[in-house]
Structure formats: structure tokens, C-alpha cells
Amino acid sequence: MSGRPNSRGSSRLFRAPSEDASSGSSGSAVLPQEENPNASGLTRSWKAVMGMVFILTLLLLGFINHMKLKEKAFPQKSRQIYAVIAEYGSRLYNYQARLRMPKEQLELLKKESQTLENNFREILFLIEQIDVLKALLRDMQDGLHNYSWNADIDPAEGWNHTEVIDEEMSNLVNYILKKLREDQVQMADYALKSAGASVVEAGTSESYKNNKAKLYWHGIGFLNYEMPPDIILQPDVHPGKCWAFPGSQGHALIKLARKIIPTAVTMEHISEKVSPSGNISSAPKEFSVYGVLKQCEGEEIFLGQFVYNKTGTTVQTFALQHEVPEFLLCVKLKILSNWGHPNYTCLYRFRVHGTPKDDS
């Protein structure tokens, strides 16, 4: 009997822990567990980190969008800046062009005034020479007058003789002034523009291009101060009033005022004394003249080759070396060389003389 109770007791003892375990397990399922304070702190820190990351992401996206908008707007601003710079440059260039134009006109006025001043000096020199001659004649008159008094000659006759000499001196002065005003060549010029002559551009060299002689507006040259080829057919010979062509060789085809048999030509250039540069290296040196048949389009007939002497007189006339049997309306001038200018040759005036055709 004592063994059975022990087995029951042992069984009780054996089940007791299972009941306790079961009761413990059931208790653990029902009763709440205690929270860990370290775990809750980590959760809050992660939330703060995620919030900061989110805010930084938003700021980064906003910055990127701002840069994209700025990059899109920059080309427009750059174009506006370039447009302002271009407009400023154009205004500055136009302002400089307006400044250049009065300078060029002032230079021309200076050249003309210098020429007039030189002519005035020559006239004053001639007047001084005339005054010297007058003084010498007065001395002679005084000597004659004294001689007349010593020879017991009537004084009235001496005074009359003095008046005659004064009149002769006045006539001499007028004659000298008349010669100064007259043409030195004393031959008709059938290449004179005012008489009806002209330059045929189709048979004439191109003019020398000089950008400094242009007036600009907004960067576009619209007014040219270069002299045309027909300036060589006009009597206005002043520094700068010449036709320039590039290089040392060129030609000009001239239609005369009427048909003539050419006998001579005249070349005129300014002197070194009135040249603003102090030299006339652009003056023509060797040149030849041809007659052209059939209304300026036919055969060329050689009339002569000549040399313009830059140290001689400014107006030089040359007799033609070959005669033509018929009347000509056109003459061609060919410049073969100049006096050393490397860029251009300048012609001031060219004349053609001869025997005109009798229209009657």
C-alpha cells in the first residue's frame, strides 16, 4: 500500500510542475510584458534621422530645380548682354565715324588754304620785285630830273616824262598780273569736261579704294570722298583733287569734246612745295598716248611716249611723235610708271590739243 501512494505522490509531484508550467505559460500569454527603454530610444532617433533625410531630400530637389530654371534663363540674359554690347559698339563706331568726317574735311581745307597761301606768297614776291623795279626807275627819274635842271631844261617837260614812266610801269604791272591769270599753255584743250569731254568708264582703270575717305552710318559706308576719273579733265588743280588708281600702271579712255587731229598733250601735277606730304612720288613718270578709232571702240594708234619730269614745271606740254591721217574723237592715256609710290598713282589734269574738224 505504501508504494501506490508514492506513485500517486510522485505523479502529483510530476504533474505539478506541468501545471505550474501550464499556468505560467497561460499567465505569460495574458499578462503584459515589461518594455525595454533602450529600444524605444532607438525608435525615436531613427524617426528623427528619417525626418532629416526627408527634409534634406526636399531641399536638394528644390536646389536642383532652381539651378535648372537658372540655366534656362541664362542664355536669354546672355543674348540680352550681347545685344547691349553690340548696340554700344555700333554707337561708338558711328561716333568715331562722325569724328573722322570733320577731320578729313579739315585736312582738305588745310590743303587748299596752304595752296592759296603759297600762291599768295608768290604774288607778294612778284609785287616786291615790281616795287624794286619801281624804285630803280624812280632813281633813274630823279637822275634825269637833276640832269634836266642842270641842263636848264623846262621842269614841266621833266614832270611829263615822269608821268609817262609811271604809266608805263602801271601797264607793265597789269601785263604781269594778266600773265599770272592766263593759262600757260595757250592752246585749246579738247579734253576739257566743261567743253563736253568725258571719261569712258568701260575703258578706264578702277579707282583706288580708300576706306578712310568714306562716311559710315551704322557700320555701312554710304558716302565716298574719292575723286572720280573725270577730275583729270577739270582745271581745278589743288592738293588732293586728283584721280588715283592702284599701282603704278593704269589707263583712261577719254572722249574728246569734238573730233580733232591731235598734235600735243599736256600733263599737269602739283609741285612738291604745295604737297602736304612734301613729295610727289605718286605723280606719273612714263606715259603713252593712243588714238582710238570708231567711236572709242576701234583700233588703237600709237601717238607717242613721254616722261613727266617731277623737278620741272608743274605744267608740261609734249608734241606728239606720230601724226594721224584722220580726225579722232577718242584718246587713250596709258600710265606706265610713277615716281616711286608703292600703292597708287595720282593724276591731276591731262589735256589734249590739236586741229579741230571744220563742221562747216
Swiss-Prot record:
GO molecular function, one term: protein-membrane adaptor activity
Signal sequence range: none
Residue ranges, compositional bias (Polar residues): 1-10
Perinuclear space topological domain residue ranges: 68-360
Coiled coil: 103-142
GO cellular component annotations of the record: meiotic nuclear membrane microtubule tethering complex; nuclear envelope; nuclear inner membrane
Keyword Transmembrane: yes
Domain of life assignment: Eukaryota
Annotated region (Disordered), positions in chain: 1-39
Membrane topology of this protein: Single-pass membrane protein
Subcellular location: Membrane; Nucleus envelope; Nucleus inner membrane
PROSITE patterns associated with the record: SUN (PS51469)
Pfam families in the cross-refs: Sad1_UNC (PF07738)
Keyword Membrane annotated: yes
Spans traversing the lipid bilayer: 48-67
Domain SUN: residue ranges: 196-357
Keywords (A to Z) from UniProt: Coiled coil, Membrane, Nucleus, Transmembrane, Transmembrane helix
Nuclear topological segments: 1-47
InterPro entries documented for this protein: SUN1-5 (IPR045119), SUN_dom (IPR012919)
Free-text comment on this protein's domains from its UniProt entry: The short coiled coil domain is proposed to be not involved in load-bearing and force transmission from the cytoskeleton but in mere nucleus anchorage instead.
SUBUNIT field: Self-associates. Interacts with SYNE1 and SPAG4/SUN4. Proposed to form a spermatogenesis-specific LINC complex with SYNE1 during sperm head formation possibly implicating a SUN domain-based heterotrimer with SPAG4/SUN4 associating with SYNE1.
Role summary: As a probable component of the LINC (LInker of Nucleoskeleton and Cytoskeleton) complex, involved in the connection between the nuclear lamina and the cytoskeleton. The nucleocytoplasmic interactions established by the LINC complex play an important role in the transmission of mechanical forces across the nuclear envelope and in nuclear movement and positioning. May be involved in nuclear remodeling during sperm head formation in spermatogenesis. A probable SUN3:SYNE1 LINC complex may tether spermatid nuclei to posterior cytoskeletal structures such as the manchette.
The protein's name in its UniProt record: SUN domain-containing protein 3
